[in-house]
């Protein structure tokens, strides 16, 4: 079946310095709409500080399956789970002292930590490819952070390109 992909970004985004960007009312309206799409199990294309991501509710098997289908990604290739904070990440991953020190130093930012899953982890096993580990990240991008916050759930988000293709760094390169 066909899946709807909502692309979340202002058309001028690539011209802005994302680290100085503030979210205006129009962007907030788009983010709220995209968060609802995430909650409804749909896919959303959104910017991070590195590449554009293809996001879905990380706790939903159906939503995660849509990511793999849309990208043509092998299901044995786990996804990165984007969260809002270290505190939230600790609900899903077991942090050693070293991992916690690294997270405090580099998050938010373009670092993914691979950690053992917590026993109460609610992330779809499909998102972690059935592994006992989980890839966690706290992005440093205002749109990504606001989307995760508004969706009120972790977002599984690989890059928004077909599997094996170059990761998109511009809005127009996101999966059609």
Model-derived segments and spans:
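Active-site-adjacent structural elements in enzyme catalytic cores
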Residues: 21-176
């Amino acid at each position: 079946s066909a899946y709807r992909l909502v692309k979340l970004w202002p058309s001028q985004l690539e011209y802005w310095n994302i680290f100085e960007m503030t979210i205006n009312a129009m962007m907030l309206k788009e983010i709220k709409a995209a968060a609802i799409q995430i909650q409804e199990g749909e896919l959303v294309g959104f910017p991070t500080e590195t590449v554009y991501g293809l996001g879905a509710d990380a706790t939903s098997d159906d939503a995660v399956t849509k990511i793999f289908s849309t990208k043509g990604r092998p299901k044995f290739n786990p996804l990165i789970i984007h969260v809002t904070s270290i505190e939230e990440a600790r609900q899903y991953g077991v942090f050693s002292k070293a991992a916690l020190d690294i997270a405090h130093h580099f998050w938010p930012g373009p670092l993914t930590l691979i950690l053992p899953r917590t026993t109460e982890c609610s992330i779809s096993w499909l998102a972690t490819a059935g592994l006992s580990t989980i890839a966690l990240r706290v992005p440093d991008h205002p749109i990504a952070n606001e989307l995760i916050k508004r969706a009120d759930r972790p977002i599984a988000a690989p890059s928004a390109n077909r599997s094996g293709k170059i990761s998109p760094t511009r809005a127009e390169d996101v999966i059609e």
